[in-house]
Amino acid sequence: MGLKDELTTFCHDVFNGNWETTEGKNVPDEDSRLTLKNTAITIDGTVLYADLDGSTAMVDGYKNWFAAEIYKTYLYCCARIIAAEGGVVTAYDGDRVMALFIGERKNTRAARAAMKIKWAVDEIIMPKKDARYTSNKFALKHVTGIDTCSLFVAKTGARGANDLVWVGRAANYAAKLTSLPSTYTYITESVYKMLADEAKTSNGKSMWEKVTWNTFNNSTIYRSNWRWRID
């Protein structure tokens, strides 16, 4: 079969085939029983995106090995904090990481992870960087976005070169939130409504500010510059 015929057959089969969906109990991965045909897993999940801000300027203005050290330390801290809060890293994309939280208190755990990442940047990564490079003025800036919804997970790509696609509002909104100013962590209203009190207030003071997402349908979102100490 020639390449044109192969592509035509595949597209015909996808558009005309029935979907076989199962309800997920665990975070799907590449070993899940998903195929390149119309198979999918549905799962209720909270998506966290953590993204470095200004990475283009960093790679343009600093040595490649220094940029790599920033990537490595930031993404390592993100991954370990996410895991400690019961989340699962589902993808790395250059200078950012996507993670999924499922089960009880998934929104609270995701929000807590975001605040811990902020603390780690300020209290671990930057002090270690400054101690090693005393004349280097680089300041690591980052932003985290979180949303929650029911996700439709399918396998995309071709044999030997494929990945999972997370279809649903949460993956898109969480990623878009990271385009907002890096001073804050951002969550959607859906996430905020599901937060436990411990992730909403501290000593009677709100940890979140209600704002309007002017560049995205004037949606209501919440932002926070609070941090969560890691012991």
UniProtKB/Swiss-Prot annotation:
It is an enzyme of class 4 (lyase). Mn(2+) 1 binds at residues 51, 95. It catalyses: UTP = 3',5'-cyclic UMP + diphosphate. Coiled coil: none annotated. Residues 46-178 form the Guanylate cyclase domain. One of its GO terms (cellular component) is cytoplasm. GO terms for biological process: defense response to virus. It comes from Xanthomonas perforans. Induction: Expression is probably induced by infection with phage T7. Its EC number is 4.6.1.26. Belongs to the adenylyl cyclase class-4/guanylyl cyclase family. Pyrimidine cyclase subfamily. GO terms for molecular function: lyase activity; metal ion binding; nucleotide binding. InterPro entries: Nucleotide_cyclase (IPR029787). Mn(2+) 2 binds at residues 51, 95. SUPFAM superfamilies: Nucleotide cyclase. The gene is pycC. Pycsar (pyrimidine cyclase system for antiphage resistance) provides immunity against bacteriophage. The pyrimidine cyclase (PycC) synthesizes cyclic nucleotides in response to infection; these serve as specific second messenger signals. The signal activates the adjacent effector, leading to bacterial cell death and abortive phage infection. A clade B Pycsar system. The pyrimidine cyclase gene of a two-gene Pycsar system, generates cyclic UMP (cUMP) from UTP probably in response to bacteriophage infection. Expression of this and adjacent effector XpPycTIR (AC P0DV29) confers resistance to bacteriophage T7. When cells expressing the Pycsar system are infected phage T7 at low multiplicity of infection (0.2 MOI) the culture survives, at 2.0 MOI bacteria enter growth arrest. The same cells enter growth arrest after exposure to 2.5 mM cUMP but not cCMP; the effector protein responds only to the cUMP produced by its cognate NTP cyclase. Its cofactor is Mn(2+). This is Uridylate cyclase. It is found in: Cytoplasm. The keyword Transport does not apply. The lineage of its organism: Bacteria, Pseudomonadati, Pseudomonadota, Gammaproteobacteria, Lysobacterales. Homodimer. Keywords: Antiviral defense, Cytoplasm, Lyase, Manganese, Metal-binding, Nucleotide-binding. A ribonucleoside 5'-triphosphate binds at residues 49, 96.
